[in-house]
């Protein structure tokens, strides 16, 4: 198996494993489990390709909530003209760097765009809802990272990355950055496991918008006033298991996935009355979905 094909497949699955753990697509078999896959020269992953799909996820009503809502989400991932299109929660990120053939280490960098709907809709708690809905944020920023290929065997990868983004719609009007680490390994030609850990750091504008309780909000909801400050507000751990229905990711087609995610609110993200009095610092979510690659 050429090393370049391993790199292409790891880039494919790593790009799909970042949707907070996001969607992933299966990769190649571990030699120790299945033996090397037969040579192929027609892999869809070695040329322009697009994956589209849909999933359903049970997630907290807002960040810090102990109520859950069922939400559908779209999936878009691809590679067009040498540019990788990778999913983000509520948006996409582009990787403008071309991987080197057979490289042990690859780099990624490019812009990202997304929206944030935290407390902008579907607030189940009546007290939090009485404090008022917030505006949708539109976030622009950049993403960059490094991926180490062939860490424990020929087909796995370990990635370190960071996103930084700013709200440009005048909602929280601040900055967020998130470092993360992820590990992707295939267990068979059709079965992939990805695990991820990340943390989030927010500035004062973000903290005040989402975590503070103003006098007006206190009067409307009965919650005590609270003045939030920036800092680390969340850590996240997730895993995803993906199964390719044809038995080989390289021929495209349909794949299904199951994901689970654990988050813990920190500092003022946990101390705000929206979490401490009306919610829970422990945040759980899980989902299923299907995607098609062509």
Locations of regions flagged by a protein language model:
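Cleavable N-terminal export/targeting peptides
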Residues: 1-46
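Outer-membrane beta-barrel transmembrane domain signature
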Residues: 82, 146-148, 167-255, 262-270, ...
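Membrane-embedded beta-strands of outer-membrane beta-barrel proteins
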Residues: 52, 74-76, 94, 142-144, ...
